[in-house]
Amino acid sequence: MPVEKLHARYVYDSRGNPTVEVDLTTQHGLFRAIVPSGASTGVHEALELRDKDASKWGGKGVLKAVQNVNEIIAPAVIDAKLDVKDQAAFDKFLLELDGTENKSKLGANAILGVSIAAARAGAGEKGVPLYEHIASLASSPQPYVLPVPFLNVLNGGSHAGGRLAIQEFMIAPTEFESFSESLRAGTEVYHELKKLAKKEYGASAGNVGDEGGVAPDIQTAEEALNLITEAIDAAGYTGKIKIAIDAASSEFYNEEANKYDLDFKNPDSDKSLWKTGEELAAYYSELIKKYPIVSFEDPFAEDDWAAWSHFVSTTDIQIVGDDLTVTNPVRIKRAIEEKSANALLLKVNQIGTITESIQAANDSYDAKWGVMVSHRSGETEDVTIADLAVGLRAGQIKTGAPSRSERLAKYNQLLRIEEELGDKAIFAGPKFHLSRAI
């Protein structure tokens, strides 16, 4: 069924910045998508088109991207009478219309909004849920797999104030029978953590960062990890809930010195304490020995390939590429060849279409990698990634703490999907890393 109407507008994300919303109308109704945006963005990501007009929204407006949908994409798509059920052909048309490698002509935020809306319309036309439509597009095996929620309960780095360099400390409730039990345990730990943070660091420590995690004035990773393990113990889930880290280390990498500064938010940081890639790897290895860490994302800067490969060869946990791979097939291929990671962080707005996201996931699965579907720090009420995680059989999702509506929207959607699927789905649990093969 072709598109009858396509219209974009700007709305606001969870950080109060403008983002693109797209409405796509067919005979079956109106289908809507909202595009997220990131705070720590990889230099190799598809281009998020911002207006750069300092007089409006501090230069972060998206009026140009909206205009590109309404004046360029919409008439072309309607004219071409594209079938919304054929996602690959639809997305190919969008890519050819843009014609650049990084989607800089029309903007990845314009293209993605249309791509997601088309996927929703395709599902609507088939009369199936979005996750089922995606599973069909991706040729995912049955049964469906509900993902382990990687809950970002403590924020540092670019997502919070304080001096903590590492960006995210997550809990992963793996040792449970269902997604709903897993999420319940995670929320109980989160509430214990808030109580402990307030007790230890004062009332303001209960305030939350961009992704809903607490952001106490913590200096070191050990301090953060001790607080989290104490919360897990207090909630009664020792051994059942694991820990994951997203270092987002490109944020504290000093290119000139080729070293990592774990005190990068301090203007008087002691340069003698800056670490080489190997020294940082040794530090991480000590943390992995001491705490129940099962996954480590972006341990090194996005182009420090040697440090990544060295770390993967010396550890047996999941090493996730985000800034390293930016959901980009070329960089994923290189990372697979150089054994620089063993899991992909899948962010649809890093690559810009549903089809390319599916391809990135399938390329990763073919290499026996894990795939973790992810939100961005600037999120909205759009729940597409919940359906994507189930449709791709990813087995793991990170979409913030169990706090703030834009984060909970995704977890709540997963609860609905779990209820709807019943015994047609299983929970990934401790097999989250290779859930495609469960």
From Swiss-Prot:
Record bears the keyword Metal-binding: yes
Q: According to its UniProt record, which residues of this chain constitute the active site?
A: 211 (proton donor), 347 (proton acceptor)
Q: What is its pathway?
A: Carbohydrate degradation; glycolysis; pyruvate from D-glyceraldehyde 3-phosphate: step 4/5
Q: Where does substrate bind?
A: 159, 168, 297, 322, 374-377, 398
Q: Where in the cell is it found?
A: Cytoplasm
Which residues are Mg(2+)-binding? Answer: 246, 297, 322
Q: Which reaction does it catalyse?
A: (2R)-2-phosphoglycerate = phosphoenolpyruvate + H2O
Co-factor: note: Mg(2+) is required for catalysis and for stabilizing the dimer.
The reply to whether Membrane figures as a keyword in the UniProt entry is: no
Needed cofactors, names only, are:
Mg(2+)
**Coiled coil regions, renumbered to chain:** none
The cross-references to NCBIfam families, in alphabetical order and at most eight, read: eno (TIGR01060)
Descriptive protein name: Enolase
State the species of origin.
Yarrowia lipolytica (strain CLIB 122 / E 150)
